[in-house]
A protein has these predicted regions:
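Bacterial Sec-dependent N-terminal signal peptides
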Residues: 1-31
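Long, intrinsically disordered, low-complexity segments
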Residues: 18-22, 126, 202, 296-354, ...
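An aromatic- and glycine-enriched ligand-binding surface/loop that stacks and positions planar moieties
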Residues: 20-100, 176, 208-209, 225-232, ...
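Conserved, well-structured interaction surfaces
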Residues: 39-55, 59-70, 93-173, 187-223, ...
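Extended glycan-interaction surfaces of carbohydrate-active proteins
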Residues: 207-210, 393-436, 519, 564, ...
């Protein structure tokens, strides 16, 4: 945090910030901006210059996929799902976070690897985003060529950037040290940690301040900027997280849990607040339209898969509410492509996906003697279309339009793996990625639908919640859930639906945490051996499940893992941060 404070202070001493950080394709304040004597008045002398400060704030927003040397690559250029039950890392190198810190239980407040943790408080980029946003808010009044409406909208964008940045911290560590202004060099560096409740309230407060001034949806030119729909959706996400049982309970989630990491009691009103946020979102959606689930062009498995793909992959559509960008073309994701063979989805995840008609896939499916083909029958998919878009399964095409190397007699098969590969964002062929600008779909409309359904179910029961879940299912051709489903069964159905819809979108980890799903952290994980009837372009397979290497958590589970440890050296700096339970 003192590094963060130092950055905030230096930016004012040396002309607000390193102006080279603000150069996007053209020279901002000369060829040697750090020594040019640039000051606040220069940086806010025009709308164009001021926008570069706000753009810098945008560039520090979280991006869930590895992107080159970006400072917030997590888990050693791996994915958050690799420490959930959906995905397993097999990368035996020294920098891999899952294998070196999580699967063996070695992560601690004093033991870490650079960029190998899921989240390292004080070393992430959120405070950079906050820094630039506050500088913008405090100085944009100096800009002479902006209308009042333009100024208010840009300030609202900056406030949402701050709220989103704190929201990321909140989900990983609970209460945070809150900076609500740009820091003066001679300011006393004391920022006491806020409680869990205070942090949630402040995030929601910033969003409430931003919502009235944001556009509901941006036009094509401004696409990627923050919107009212995104702010309202993020508000629901935070309220739902805070209302969930891990934090909203009379029973503490850990013996050392305190006011910084939970409420310490149960209140139904927290669920009601989440439900109200959902009501407000859908009331606005009914009035303004413009957002909707991307629908298939025809009622076929391939069309449904492509509609689902467009919903998460494509910029400027009707589904992504918060889009974060790190680059334009597919090369932005080269690190992901390069590492695609060294981790794999678990059979546990694959088994969550129902048959194509919506019927549950059997828990006791006989893989050695299947009564029905589990992936393809005469070339036609037999399962939920989202399975194939999230997971490369035996018989599908992969990356460069060749057979996915996931069956044992494929010439490129790797013995260290799960028998599956990640498909999402990687896709089947180069043509799928060409001329298709990339993004991180930080928040999508299906999450708002399912979050609202969850809140309704917890407050009122299933009846009024079902239609929101069924919208998500119907888009990919699945049948409605039973109309007589009970509250607990619907709760499970929603959590599963979220796993299916948001694979590799950083949703599953937080769902497991907020619902205290210790059994999912401890359960055995499986892979699947598949052998094709021929080496090239097989049309049928034989199968055999196998156990993946047990993680430390299986026999040594501790709920401390629900929140990240605070590095001890951060606490020792004495500005106000405290340790999380169990660490």
């Amino acid at each position: 945090m003192k590094n963060i404070i130092k950055l905030l202070s230096i930016c004012l001493v040396c002309g607000v910030c390193s102006c080279s950080d603000l150069t996007f394709g053209d020279k901002f304040l000369g060829s040697q901006p750090e020594s040019s004597g640039a000051v606040l008045d220069s940086m806010f002398s025009s709308k164009v210059n001021a926008d570069k400060v706000l753009t810098s704030a945008y560039t520090y927003l979280p991006y869930g996929l590895p992107t080159g040397a970006a400072p917030n690559n997590k888990l050693g250029v791996n994915l958050l799902e690799a420490i959930s039950d959906l995905y397993q890392s097999f990368r035996n190198n020294a920098s891999d976070g899952p294998t070196n810190l999580y699967y063996n239980g070695l992560l601690s407040a004093n033991n870490s690897l650079a960029n190998a943790e899921a989240y390292r408080y004080g070393s992430e980029s959120q405070y950079n985003a906050i820094r630039y946003a506050w500088i913008y808010i405090e100085n944009v009044a100096k800009v002479p060529d902006m209308t009042e409406d333009e100024r208010n909208e840009r300030i609202a964008e900056a406030k949402m950037i701050i709220a989103l940045s704190y929201a990321e911290m909140f989900r990983y560590v609970g209460g945070v040290c809150w900076i609500d202004h740009s820091i003066e060099p001679n300011e006393t560096m004391e920022f006491p940690r806020l409680t869990f409740a205070e942090t949630a309230d402040k995030i929601v407060g910033l969003l409430n301040e931003a919502i009235p001034y944001l556009k509901w949806k941006q036009d094509e030119i401004e696409d990627g900027r923050m919107t009212k729909a995104g702010a309202m959706g993020l508000k629901l996400r935070i309220l739902l997280f805070a209302a969930s049982p891990t934090f909203n309970s009379d029973i503490k989630w850990h013996s050392q849990a305190d006011e910084y990491t939970c409420y310490g009691n149960y209140s139904k009103k927290r669920w009601e607040d989440a439900m109200k946020a959902g009501q407000e979102f859908f009331a606005e959606l009914d009035k303004r339209q413009e957002y909707a689930l991307t629908q298939p062009a025809e009622p076929t498995a391939q069309a449904r898969r492509l509609a689902y793909r467009a919903g998460y992959y494509d910029r400027g559509g009707t589904e992504v509410l918060v889009s974060i960008r790190r680059g334009y073309n597919e090369s932005t994701h080269n690190n992901l492509f390069d590492q695609r063979f060294y981790s794999g989805p678990t059979l546990n995840y694959v088994n969550m996906f129902p048959w194509a008609d919506g019927e549950d896939f059997p828990e006791n499916f006989n893989w050695e003697h299947p009564s029905k083909q589990p992936f393809f029958e005469n070339g036609e998919p037999t399962r939920d279309p989202r399975l194939y878009e999230n997971v490369a399964v035996p018989g599908d095409r992969y990356f460069n339009d060749t057979q996915a190397p996931v069956y044992t007699n494929h010439q490129d098969y790797r013995a260290e793996g799960s028998g599956f590969l990640m498909m999402k964002f990687i896709l089947q062929a180069a043509s799928d990625r060409q001329n298709r600008p990339v993004q991180w779909p930080y928040l999508r409309l299906p999450e708002v639908l399912l979050s609202y359904a969850e809140a309704i179910n917890e407050v009122e029961g299933p009846e009024n919640a079902l239609s929101y879940v069924n919208q998500v299912r119907n888009r990919v051709g699945l049948s409605d859930l039973p109309s007589n489903i009970g509250q607990s069964d619907l709760r499970e159905a929603i959590l599963r639906e979220r796993a299916l819809e948001f694979g590799f979108e950083e949703v599953r980890w937080f769902d497991l945490v907020r619902w205290g799903r210790k059994d999912d952290f401890r359960k055995k994980l499986y892979g699947l051996y598949s052998k094709g009837d021929k080496v090239n372009n097989p049309t049928s397979f034989t199968f055999a499940p196998y156990e993946l290497t047990l993680r430390y958590w299986a026999n040594n589970w501790d709920s401390k893992w629900y929140m990240a440890p605070i590095p001890q050296k951060e606490i020792n700096k004495g500005y106000g941060m405290t340790q999380n339970p169990g660490w």
